[in-house]
Amino acid sequence: MSDNQQNLRLTARVGYEAHFSWSYLKPQYWGIWLGIFFLLLLAFVPFRLRDKLTGKLGIWIGHKAKKQRTRAQTNLQYCFPHWTEQQREQVIDKMFAVVAQVMFGIGEIAIRSKKHLQKRSEFIGLEHIEQAKAEGKNIILMVPHGWAIDASGIILHTQGMPMTSMYNPHRNPLVDWLWTITRQRFGGKMHARQNGIKPFLSHVRKGEMGYYLPDEDFGAEQSVFVDFFGTYKATLPGLNKMAKLSKAVVIPMFPRYNAETGKYEMEIHPAMNLSDDPEQSARAMNEEIESFVTPAPEQYVWILQLLRTRKDGEDLYD
């Protein structure tokens, strides 16, 4: 058993823990450290200047990143078949601008104070979380893949809301360590997906808010096919079971980054009324995603293989 596998098992109950190693100071990691130093410098650059420059850089990178752009084009073509090609390309350009603005702003999220991050954030519908907490209910936040998804999770901690989430450890151990300490800087726990869902649900039952990302494609065996925008998608159906096992309500939330105001926006909807029927539960989840994404499609991670599993076995991304 490798050291990494052993570490995953040992931390199954307490949460994933990445540890610093002196080997991270070897020359092979110097490029990463240089990049980190650059991001930390950007943390103190006024957001309007930083966002203006990085937004333009993101659009330029988006035209160079052929594989990612093609995936986004495919996803938008199926999800919004009524759009013109020009409309889809405009959304993709805006998306890559958001990508760069969020990524080059991560140093700010990693080291600036709670007070600073609170000023840089805005909650829309926070009363839905407050009501559930006041009623003594456990909470699972159903959070679609927006580009500001990591930043919003950290910002929630600044509001006294400890989070627990599942996480795929990064292949590069230094990057993995840096991401983990950033995500956990204000508390909460990350759980390695390799340990399954039980540790995650256990922490939700203990009162930590679950941070659940529902929209990846995990294949036909684990999914049901339900409508998704203008097409269909292999969708995980177990959200209602997760809620029952953790005795929690499921509250949808979508993170956005607004470059005009320089704020991370968290839009929160009322708790979902989930059906025991797997297909109805999965469709309700997709309806929430659609309601979040349709007004601001550039905020969604369209470069994922969202439609990888098709009924006829076709590979849309080949």
Curated annotation (Swiss-Prot):
Query: Major location, coarse class?
Result: membrane
Annotated GO molecular function terms are: acyltransferase activity; acyltransferase activity, transferring groups other than amino-acyl groups
GO terms of biological process kind: glycolipid biosynthetic process; Kdo2-lipid A biosynthetic process; lipopolysaccharide biosynthetic process
InterPro entries linked to this entry: LipA_acyltrans (IPR004960), Lipid_A_MsbB (IPR011921)
Q: Where are the transmembrane segments?
A: 27-47
* Cellular component terms (Gene Ontology): Gram-negative-bacterium-type cell wall; membrane; plasma membrane
Is Chaperone one of the keywords UniProt gives this record?
A: no
Q: Would the keyword Membrane be found if you checked this record's keyword annotation?
A: yes
Quote the function comment for this protein: Catalyzes the transfer of an acyl chain from an acyl-[acyl-carrier-protein] (ACP) to a Kdo(2)-(acyl)-lipid IV(A) to form a Kdo(2)-lipid A.
Q: Supply the name of the protein.
A: Lipid A biosynthesis acyltransferase
The beginning of the lineage is:
Bacteria, Pseudomonadati, Pseudomonadota, Gammaproteobacteria, Pasteurellales
